[in-house]
Amino acid sequence: KGVARRDLLAMLQAKRPWVDAKLRQQQQRMAVRPRYQYQTGERLPYLDTELTLHVMQGTRGACIREADTLHVYWSPRSRKTVPEQTAQAVAQWYRAEALRLLEAKTQRLCDSVGLTCHGVNVRATRSKWGHCTFDGRIQYNWQIVLAPTPVVDYLVAHEVSHLRHHNHSRAFWQHVHAICPDYQRLRVWLRDEGHRLILPPYER
């Protein structure tokens, strides 16, 4: 037991520089994660463009896009502050748009490669951008629509490929490459920049 314990301590000590580097990397990433005040004039990323917020009073909370403007209505009857209402309405709009977009892209790609998806849904997950179940359902992180369109297309190609290959084998990556030839560059982009793709709640 003593030898095993010494070996374990030695292994942990050897890995300490790697662990410290990862912790520093995470701290740096957290420092550059976006923070929004959810005020009129603020610009939010959406696919290949930016949307400008226009916040105004209404009878109830709502969010409507008109060209490159998001009109957000807040309710004076709500107990939440105006920025809190705005953040909530914006998140609901993004989530609904993500579901609409990802359902369409997934179905279109499935049709073109002869695969069947039994359902698409979206969530705000912390660790994964997408997930394909063994029964053919695909789940996406809705915040992927904060990324450029080619990155979104790569993610869809990745998850649709899992409908045929439920692993990350060579055959899987060959399938991804066949429908998204530039997948390696886009995969690296998502790995390196994914921490920026977030619409956080309002923080005072």
Set out the residue ranges of the language-model regions.
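Walker B catalytic acidic pair
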Residues: 159
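Active-site-proximal or metal-binding-adjacent scaffold patches in catalytic folds
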Residues: 1-154, 163-204
